[in-house]
């Protein structure tokens, strides 16, 4: 399978998998932006993508940014549908206690390509019973 990438900014870096077998590809900022504590901003990557048929791209945080600085992707995982052709933008939020500077060329998120299913939705009067039933939200312990 191929992921087609179009640069919309000369500073853009094409996403890649750092190691063989990695699920995610790093996404990079094309701009310098400062995020104050509890502030969120849209960060530009300078790329558009064309996904393979029957796939989606999930945008996820980078664990190092989250652990060391409290920087995460606000709507994680963000979903890019197969038919979307606009620039990929990443909504970052600073959950840390100090300002954080996003540098040009910095790895800001990761993109994972996943298969999608097209389902036929059917309304029913009642669902089948299970042993779990409606128990959720910590019902098996905290």
Swiss-Prot record:
Enzyme class name: hydrolase
Pathway(s) it belongs to: Pyrimidine metabolism; dUMP biosynthesis; dUMP from dCTP (dUTP route): step 2/2
GO biological process: dUMP biosynthetic process; dUTP catabolic process
Keywords annotated in UniProt: Hydrolase, Magnesium, Metal-binding, Nucleotide metabolism
Positions annotated to bind substrate: 62-64, 75, 79-81
GO molecular function: dUTP diphosphatase activity; magnesium ion binding
Catalytic function, reaction form: dUTP + H2O = dUMP + diphosphate + H(+)
UniProt-listed Enzyme Commission number(s): 3.6.1.23
Signal sequence extent: none
Requisite cofactors: Mg(2+)
Alphabetical list of InterPro entries matching this protein: dUTPase, dUTPase-like, dUTPase-like_sf, dUTPase_trimeric
Family: Belongs to the dUTPase family.
Function, as annotated: This enzyme is involved in nucleotide metabolism: it produces dUMP, the immediate precursor of thymidine nucleotides and it decreases the intracellular concentration of dUTP so that uracil cannot be incorporated into DNA.
Entry protein name: Deoxyuridine 5'-triphosphate nucleotidohydrolase
Originating species: Clostridium novyi (strain NT)
Source lineage: Bacteria, Bacillati, Bacillota, Clostridia, Eubacteriales
